[in-house]
Curated annotation (Swiss-Prot):
PROSITE patterns: HELICASE_ATP_BIND_1, HELICASE_CTER
GO cellular-component term (any): primosome complex
Binding site for Zn(2+) 1: C336, C339, C376, C379
Protein name: Replication restart protein PriA
Motif segment (DEAH box): 228-231
One example of a Gene Ontology biological process annotation: double-strand break repair
UniProt cross-references to InterPro entries, sorted A to Z: DEAD/DEAH_box_helicase_dom, Helicase_ATP-bd, Helicase_C-like, P-loop_NTPase, PriA, PriA_3primeBD, PriA_3primeBD_sf, PriA_C
NCBIfam families hit by this protein: priA (TIGR00595), PRK05580.2-1 (NF004069)
Molecular function terms from GO: 3'-5' DNA helicase activity; ATP binding; ATP hydrolysis activity; DNA binding; zinc ion binding
Alphabetical list of PANTHER family matching this protein: PRIMOSOMAL PROTEIN N
């Protein structure tokens, strides 16, 4: 008789002991009886016979691979998350007959000498940062690294931050790796996911391109992980467990013989500081030499005569333009011109956004919506106007001002399904549309030959925000959007901002900005300090505050040396009818932070809170 400690999946019950007539390996998936139900569980370890009576488990053909088990345990510990919830993120493996595919000989473009040198340098390190300018040929280096990995009979994973990147990236990779390639993201149907996993089990799929959840797939003999656009905040989960997929990849490179390459034209300050003295590979210049002219317009207006002239020139030459707008929908706020009050969500302490497509105001936090009011609820005035412009308003204005222009929008409202996303991108690629207006989705990795003009509107709303990363996020975004223009033909970048004197200093070389920001960034914030954010919420504001005060008192006796604590009302005070209070822990030593949080959670299990280790922002 054998006894095993089992973590029930999709259940917050702590690990339980079950018996079996045969021995099971760590990571095996088993069926277990629990509260009159049969659940899946994961074997954590074999244990001695307990003093109490145990129920019997039943084996299944599925199991988690060693790297998956190691990663799950690390996530639970580092992010202070429930192990059963973490294990539920992972897709298990199943042994089956291997598909006898004909060996694919990838037909790759020949690398330039600079690219060849960069690839050789990357291969010297288990983890490295490929800091390559937009258009410098990072993707070609990725493909050569992947081909070499597959040649060694190992599998490879290419992570991209958003689904919007995957169709175009997939097309380029499909031509080279054919049936060895599989695409994974959250919008696949259950049937599509099942078919995908069957091909993964048979090792028909050896290369996976996917968003952050692809890291939890059972890739047998995983030898290479590439994190494209590593700076992107989309790699950070905002639901428990609040992991960062990029950081998890670096952990795997430390624990297993898995090479990790982080790639970006605008690497995060954290990654730049981590790699700049040991494993940073710099790739300067463009693979295709083109000219790019940067035009600044110091204005708070959006659709100006100067911008219209630039767009008309693009249309006259039968070329294309992309326009970045920081807000989807029509306006960030609907503002009364008499009392200057905006329309706020009744359940959250944030302004609602105007969506003309559905004729509604919507809260982007709790998704509450309401009809557009005709009068101000505060003063009864009928003069309500938008404070900030959005994608739909830009579309409507340009359609009325640019005769014959074919304009489309790329934002979350217009890409609710994979089919809609494909249609928008395919139409733009086929030049069925001349102008593509988008939010941050438009900055991410798109490569279109006829784009000769990239327009940046409203960047001031980002660089003037309250975030400690505001300038980094804004300048990075400028570079990324500018990189969509003049990839194969000469072009222009048109930037509207009242901060032109500041931004002009950083548009020659992004590394200049990184070095500037390393000097200017306060030592209280990353990459110099590590942060952990604890959130306490309640429908009653006073009780939410009491929870945070009680937690502060308990934490004070749990803090490791060098950990500081600050307690405050959340900048967004209320979300989904719950009031929010935050405790921010800081330390230069991440282990001290983790120990402090673990001690607090153990000392005060009755105080409900969410733990966000390494938050990308404080809101």
């Amino acid at each position: 008789m054998f006894y095993h400690l089992i973590a029930p999946l999709k259940n917050k019950t702590p690990p339980l002991t079950y018996f079996s007539k045969e021995q099971h390996q760590k990571g095996a998936l088993v069926n277990i009886p629990l509260r009159n139900k049969t659940l899946l569980g994961v074997v954590l370890e074999e244990v001695s016979k307990p003093s109490f009576e145990c129920l019997e488990l039943e084996k299944t053909p599925y199991f988690l691979l060693p790297f998956q088990m190691e990663l799950a345990i690390f996530i639970a510990q580092y992010y202070s998350a429930n192990l059963s919830s973490v294990l539920s993120l992972f897709a298990p493996f199943k042994e089956c007959d291997l598909v006898g595919l004909e060996k694919i000989e990838p037909i790759l473009n020949i690398l330039s000498q600079t690219q060849t040198n960069a690839l050789k340098e990357l291969q010297k390190h288990s983890a490295s940062l490929l800091f390559g300018d937009t258009g410098s040929g990072k993707t070609e280096i990725y493909m050569h690294a992947i081909a070499q990995t597959l040649e060694q009979k190992k599998s490879a994973l290419l992570l991209v931050p958003e689904i919007a990147l995957t169709p175009q990236m997939q097309q380029r990779l499909k031509r080279v790796f054919k049936e060895n390639l599989g695409l994974w993201h959250s919008k696949l149907s259950q049937n599509q996911k099942k078919q995908f996993l069957e091909k993964l089990y048979s090792q028909e799929i050896k290369l996976v391109v996917g968003t952050r959840s692809a890291l939890f797939l059972p890739l047998k003999e995983l030898g290479l992980i590439i994190v494209d656009e590593e700076h992107d905040f989309s790699y950070k989960s905002h639901q428990s467990p609040m992991y960062n997929a990029r950081d998890l990849c670096l952990y795997l490179s430390h624990k297993f013989p898995i090479q990790v390459i982080l790639g970006s034209a605008t690497p995060s300050l954290n990654s730049y500081k981590r790699f700049k003295d040991k494993a940073l590979v710099r790739l300067k210049g463009r693979y295709t030499p083109t000219q790019k002219n940067i035009i600044f317009e110091k204005t708070e207006r959006f659709i100006t005569p100067k911008l219209l002239e630039a767009l008309q020139q693009v249309l006259d030459k039968n070329e294309q333009a992309i326009i970045f707008v920081p807000t989807r929908a029509n306006f960030k706020t609907l503002l009364c011109q008499s009392c200057y009050k905006s329309v706020q969500c009744p359940f959250c302490s944030v302004n609602m956004s105007l969506h003309l497509k559905t004729n509604k105001l919507m809260c982007h936090y709790c998704h509450f919506s309401s009809p557009i009011p005709k009068i101000c609820s505060a003063c009864q005035s009928e003069v309500l106007v938008g404070k900030r412009i959005g994608t739909m308003q830009v579309l409507k204005e340009l359609e009325s001002l640019l005769e014959g222009a074919k304009i489309a929008i790329l934002d979350k409202d217009h890409t609710s399904t994979q089919k809609k996303l494909h249609n928008i991108l395919n139409d733009f690629n086929a030049q069925k549309t001349n102008i593509l207006i988008g939010t941050q989705m438009i900055s991410k990795g798109h490569d279109y030959a006829k784009v000769s003009l990239a327009v940046v509107l409203g960047i001031d709303n980002i660089i003037k925000s309250n975030s400690y990363r505001a300038l980094e996020e804004g300048v990075s975004l400028l570079y990324q959007i500018a990189g969509r223009s003049a990839r194969q033909i000469s072009g222009q970048v048109f930037i509207q901002s009242t901060e032109t004197d500041l931004l002009e200093n950083f548009l020659e070389d992004y590394e200049d900005f990184l070095q500037y920001e390393l000097q200017e960034r306060c030592e209280l914030y990353p990459p110099f300090s590590r942060l952990c954010l604890l959130e306490f919420k309640h429908k009653n504001e006073e009780k939410a505050q009491q929870l945070s005060l009680k937690a502060s008192q308990t934490l004070s006796s749990c803090l490791e040396k060098g950990v500081t604590l600050s307690n405050f009302k959340a900048p967004i005070e209320k979300i989904a009818s719950s009031y929010r209070y935050l405790i921010l822990l800081r330390s230069k030593n991440p282990l001290s932070l983790i120990k402090s949080v673990h001690a607090f959670l153990k000392s005060a299990p009755s105080i409900p809170c969410s733990v966000n280790m390494d938050p990308v922002d404080i809101f």
